[in-house]
Swiss-Prot record:
The lineage of its organism: Archaea, Methanobacteriati, Methanobacteriota, Thermococci, Thermococcales. Keywords: ATP-binding, Hydrolase, Nucleotide-binding. This is Nucleoside-triphosphatase THEP1. Coiled coil: none annotated. One of its GO terms (molecular function) is ATP binding. Belongs to the THEP1 NTPase family. Signal peptide: none annotated. ATP binds at residues 7-14, 98-105. Has nucleotide phosphatase activity towards ATP, GTP, CTP, TTP and UTP. May hydrolyze nucleoside diphosphates with lower efficiency. It catalyses: a ribonucleoside 5'-triphosphate + H2O = a ribonucleoside 5'-diphosphate + phosphate + H(+). Pfam families: NTPase_1. Its EC number is 3.6.1.15. The keyword ATP-binding applies.
Amino acid sequence: MRFFVSGMPGVGKTTLAKRIADEVRREGFKVGGIITEEIREGGKRTGFRVIALDTGEIGRLAYVGYGYPRLGKYVIDVEGFERVAIPALSRALRGADLIVIDEIGPMEFKSNEFLKALGLVLKSEKHLLATVHRRLVDRYRPLGEYYWLTPENRNAVFSEILGRIKGLLKEK
């Protein structure tokens, strides 16, 4: 089963993905994939990092600066992103009970290797929890269960998705 979560920036998509990954892991299941976090300096967002859920390895996804490829004010570090994300997704396909991808978005789409890995995940029978950039919702909504996260519903969405995933994994 695939679960896709979207919402406005800062609503809690990454927090939801991390909380669900932690809870599923606590139940004794293997969780793999990636989480993307903001990098902040002096209270300002200066970039993004990617973290492998199974190893904790960190790579840089984007930073404020000069260079290419760009997305808005950010330079995308395709090599830094791929160094962590591609092996993490490959390992998750081989051995995880749940794959988490945070986020499917325009920055990640600058990587052809990520697009290939995402395609393999979507073709697999693995359970997937993915956060999706709001501009890409229409592309992924038909592929699984879809949730629009808001401050008002985020606790209910967390409980619903967690309950569904735990139920699916316990059926195995």
